[in-house]
């Protein structure tokens, strides 16, 4: 899958000044961003996150999901480490796009859970494709990750494409009354490893 590097610039944030690397997915025209910090090409496992775009959670402070909180927590963790990488993939709504995501939310308002809503609209529960991660990581010289995720599918996908996942770092944050069913559904139907349901994992603020 052709993904080409376009340009890089500094991105000052409240957490750290990252390098913002821009990539173009030629087949779809989607523009992806990778934030990097420190020396990530030295061969040692890199603290990282693969984060799919969520306009409602990342930019509009929605409490229907935990996406915005996870994004902030990941950026803070990388800043504390002084070294890391965050892939921001333009795969809104687990790959169904923003307008279909709003349609799915409408169905959820009527009682459907997040998986049922996608399926009623004719989509798979999760349509994201992580193959685009490989050329971006290769460009940055990253071959091993300490991956911040609760999603075993991400671990499996990266491992199958030859990226070493040296450690899975749980990322439990952003729980609130509005997303209780959403998080429970991710655990029960999408096999996400959510907090107290798994011994030895500690919630992270």
Curated annotation (Swiss-Prot):
Cofactor annotation remark: Binds 1 zinc ion per subunit.
The record's section on Pfam families has:
GTP_cyclohydro2
What is the scientific name of the source organism?
Answer: Pseudomonas fluorescens (strain SBW25)
Q: What is this protein called?
A: GTP cyclohydrolase-2
Q: Name one GO cellular component term.
A: cytosol
Which biological process annotations from GO are given for this protein? Answer: riboflavin biosynthetic process
Secretion signal span: none
Q: Does the keyword GTP-binding apply?
A: yes
Q: Which residues bind GTP?
A: 49-53, 70, 92-94, 114, 149, 154
> Could you tell me what reaction this enzyme catalyses?
GTP + 4 H2O = 2,5-diamino-6-hydroxy-4-(5-phosphoribosylamino)-pyrimidine + formate + 2 phosphate + 3 H(+)
Protein task: Catalyzes the conversion of GTP to 2,5-diamino-6-ribosylamino-4(3H)-pyrimidinone 5'-phosphate (DARP), formate and pyrophosphate.
Q: What residues sit in the active site?
A: 126 (proton acceptor), 128 (nucleophile)
The Enzyme Commission number assigned here is: 3.5.4.25
